[in-house]
């Protein structure tokens, strides 16, 4: 790929600490140098940084605290300011300004908030400012869980309209088996599609400070590739790794973007976590998959969760297959009332209607 590129670089806690209990500043200095070099060459760089909790623990002198959500939030609140201060200090050596964006998955659930975040991201990039993004761990609750910053980096790549997403980790890439305990494990260089076989060989990282593993990196790669973004998983310790990815030099494991990526509007649908789910019968399933039809209330069997009109929900088959992510035209209570009924009965049952379909085909992404 020639010309100016937009690259999102995700740095996990294991990369930032080198497996220790404190931030490895020498290594972070080197990564900033690589980013600054590419920035000077005209490329747009976005940083997705982990490490707030580790930075907070270090700043407080490694206190003995209970392993609770509240403790993680406390450490994140203390560490986040230390972390952004470090990024700001190091990038300033090269005359580069940074802009902090603290996000949660909730910022991706609402269309307006998604667009606002996208506008902020693009404004920073247009003004040659490096966005530094992290999960807002100090206020997030359910979001503090395995894989948040992996998945967050894929969503950041969508917000930035990135060309590539680089997931830096403590492993050289994705292997055929866990290289820590299998000497015959081989590095997988190229991936053109993520399937169940690939997911089954993804192992978890050994770091006790972070929240990510290889399986969540596959999830992130899947989201980004479907949005038309190439993804590379590589070792953060490899010299010149950021420049290699920009230059398309083979490094780590590369996941190729789909030839027919999701349209811009559907990026948000695919990235948003489902607020609930519905199960459809075989007739509706066939209409959706084979004819590209909208979903009518008649084909709905069950409704799970409580969600509002306009939220993203999951569509499942009777066999339990995850069929699609979609924006619902009706809330969960309304869907329970009209499920199994003909479209002509909607107004009679509800006293109002938003049209004859429960989900329009343009608001649906088939998995």
Curated annotation (Swiss-Prot):
Q: Which UniProt keywords apply?
A: Amino-acid biosynthesis, ATP-binding, Cytoplasm, Kinase, Nucleotide-binding, Proline biosynthesis, Transferase
Which enzyme class, named as a word?
transferase
Read off the InterPro entries from this record: AceGlu_kinase-like_sf (IPR036393), Asp/Glu/Uridylate_kinase (IPR001048), G5K_ProB (IPR041739), Glu/AcGlu_kinase (IPR001057), Glu_5kinase (IPR011529), Glu_5kinase/COase_Synthase (IPR005715), Glutamate_5-kinase_CS (IPR019797), PUA (IPR002478)
Which reaction is recorded as catalysed by this protein?
Answer: L-glutamate + ATP = L-glutamyl 5-phosphate + ADP
What the protein does comes down to: Catalyzes the transfer of a phosphate group to glutamate to form L-glutamate 5-phosphate.
Q: Which NCBIfam families match?
A: proB (TIGR01027)
Name the record gives this protein = Glutamate 5-kinase
Which species expresses this protein natively?
A: Pectobacterium atrosepticum (strain SCRI 1043 / ATCC BAA-672) (Erwinia carotovora subsp. atroseptica)
